[in-house]
Amino acid sequence: MRIARRILPLLATPAFAQARFPNRPIRFLIPWPPGGSLDALHRRMFEVFQQDTGQPVLIENIAGARGTRGATFLVQQGRPDGYTLAHHHLSIIRHPFLTRQPTWDPVADFTYIMQITGFVFGTVVRADSPYRTWADLIAAARQKPGELTYSTSGIATSNHIAMELLLERERASMTHIPFRGSQEGVTALLGRQITAISDSSSWREQVLAGQFRLLSVWTPTRLPSFPDTPTLLDLGYGMSVTSPYGITGPKGMEPEVVDFLHRAFRKALLDEGSQRIMAQWEMPNEYLGPQAYTEFARERAAFERETVARLGLTID
């Protein structure tokens, strides 16, 4: 009888009633094309996860729709069993406020598991560009409204909104060229198809190789790799932009599964190889656990609602 009493509490836990979690591969949706710091960090973390749990995390890159396809899948088709997860970023929290027919609640319709880090944004031009400083680029954008172009990874993304705020403040105008991911912007700039990139650090290798020139970084402090490049704070804008991101699942996940995933991913993030990638790409530490990440999403949703309304942004 004592044995039976010890087993019953385990059987009462739905997530672990049938078998130990995880007992099959986990699907992970990334709504951007492969490449860059995000891709490198996730792949290393998932290697560690597999070593620790015996199960792989299989990445699926599903680019498009301003980085919201992963969230759309979680809301419309995801089962709350822990076997389908997705990369989660600020555009997903912002998305419902951009349309008259929102398809999800940015807090209630997701299970927030762990915030990881944030993007390192900056503005770059080709090394042979006539614009040697941020001030040069802004002056030209003011003199030739709409003629200069800049790319981001999508309409109404954090970097798109930030760039438009900067241009508005400077009474300047550039034409926005949205791509499905930051790597496409690198290709376009290499091919002289655009004037500049204002996006995450997929441009890093080209800057180090002397192909691109970095005009500004959007981090709170200067980057050790580019100590001579000013931040937006240095330039007098009083702002920084990192756009933190993390891991979520469908709403309604069992707390035991969330706790298991959080602990496993936290261990993977603290792995020496993962930390080496973060240092290499100079990625900020934006870690939050499930409760703090959920609270962050709730507070950020209020901020995004106000910002979108103030700027009159819409995707309808």
PLM segments and residue spans:
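Stable alpha-helical elements in mature extracytoplasmic
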Residues: 37-41, 45, 66, 70, ...
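N-terminal (or domain-start) structured segment
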Residues: 18-109, 147, 155, 171-201, ...
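Hinge/capping helix and adjacent helix->loop/strand transition within the periplasmic-binding protein
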Residues: 76-83, 97-184, 232, 242-277
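N-terminal secretory signal peptides and thylakoid transit peptides that target proteins
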Residues: 1-11
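Short beta-strand->loop
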Residues: 105-115, 151, 173-177, 204-240, ...
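An extracytoplasmic/periplasmic, membrane-proximal ligand-sensing/linker region
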Residues: 23-25, 168-172, 255-316
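Solvent-exposed coil/turn segments that connect beta secondary-structure elements
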Residues: 90-92, 118, 128, 201-202, ...
